[in-house]
């Protein structure tokens, strides 16, 4: 075979292989991205964030420092004791996060949507679980958070902010007074972002008796109890309980 013909044949074959490799590479990238968008939720759930903030810093794959967190303190606004709210903020600042507070009873849905969309992660503080869910549904924040978590935005929940992710929050009656702040609230459907029921503050003062009663009365549910020193970390479909039990 003449030299020029062999050279031409080599160029054609090389081009075909190069195109095939390029298409295969792009196919893998698209498939991975599509799957990631569907399933890669990132959720960090705890009872007392100030006690487990270090766990978050060690388990996230991307650095937190310099990111902005949408901080929702709404569950606490009618509570007598709220020190945990400031403790949570201080723990976030210690991780290098910038806080954008959004008390959802003071904003309309469009404003809340913009803040949640602009921030890098979402933090929902503790307080009354039923009041929090009532205001989530009233403002549309429940749907906004489900949308953001579905897109892979990191969600950090503390206490009530943890329990609202369950399929239903009626089991929280053992811990929170649902009649005092929400006398007309009777839709106990949770966000349903998770398919289990976290029992926060398990065997932790002053909720020792309340959490034990939940374990006894709701043994038919897939409960996951966590103490103040533990956290539930979810990546996609993988779930891990981290930290030490008290």
For the regions a language model picked out, list residue spans one by one:
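N-terminal beta1-alpha1 cap of cysteine-dependent amidohydrolase-like domains
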Residues: 34-121, 125
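A residue-level signal for conserved active-site and pocket-lining positions in enzyme catalytic cores
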Residues: 69, 122, 159, 198, ...
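Short, active-site-adjacent cap segments at secondary-structure transitions
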Residues: 130, 162-165, 231-233
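Conserved anion/nucleotide-ligand pocket segment
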Residues: 189-194, 198-235
């Amino acid at each position: 075979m003449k030299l020029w013909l062999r050279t031409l044949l080599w160029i054609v074959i090389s081009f075909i292989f190069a195109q095939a490799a390029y298409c295969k590479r792009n196919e893998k990238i698209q498939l991975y991205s599509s799957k990631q968008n569907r399933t890669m939720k990132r959720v960090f759930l705890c009872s007392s964030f100030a006690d487990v903030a270090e766990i978050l810093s060690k388990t996230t794959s991307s650095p937190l420092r310099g990111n902005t967190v949408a901080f929702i303190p709404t569950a606490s606004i009618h509570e007598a004791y709220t020190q945990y709210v400031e403790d949570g903020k201080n723990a976030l600042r210690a991780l290098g996060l910038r806080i954008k507070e959004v008390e959802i009873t003071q904003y309309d849905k469009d404003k809340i949507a913009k803040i949640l969309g602009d921030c890098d992660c979402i933090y929902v503080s503790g307080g009354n679980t039923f009041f929090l869910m009532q205001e989530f549904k009233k403002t549309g924040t429940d749907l906004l958070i489900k949308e953001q978590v579905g897109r892979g935005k990191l969600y950090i929940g503390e206490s009530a902010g943890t329990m609202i992710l369950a399929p239903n929050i009626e089991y929280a009656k053992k811990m929170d007074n649902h009649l005092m702040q929400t006398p007309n609230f009777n839709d106990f459907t949770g966000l349903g972002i998770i398919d289990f029921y976290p029992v926060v503050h398990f065997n932790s003062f002053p909720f020792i008796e309340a959490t034990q009663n939940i374990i006894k009365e709701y043994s038919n549910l897939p409960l996951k109890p966590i103490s103040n020193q533990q956290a539930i970390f979810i990546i996609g479909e993988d779930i891990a309980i981290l930290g030490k039990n008290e």
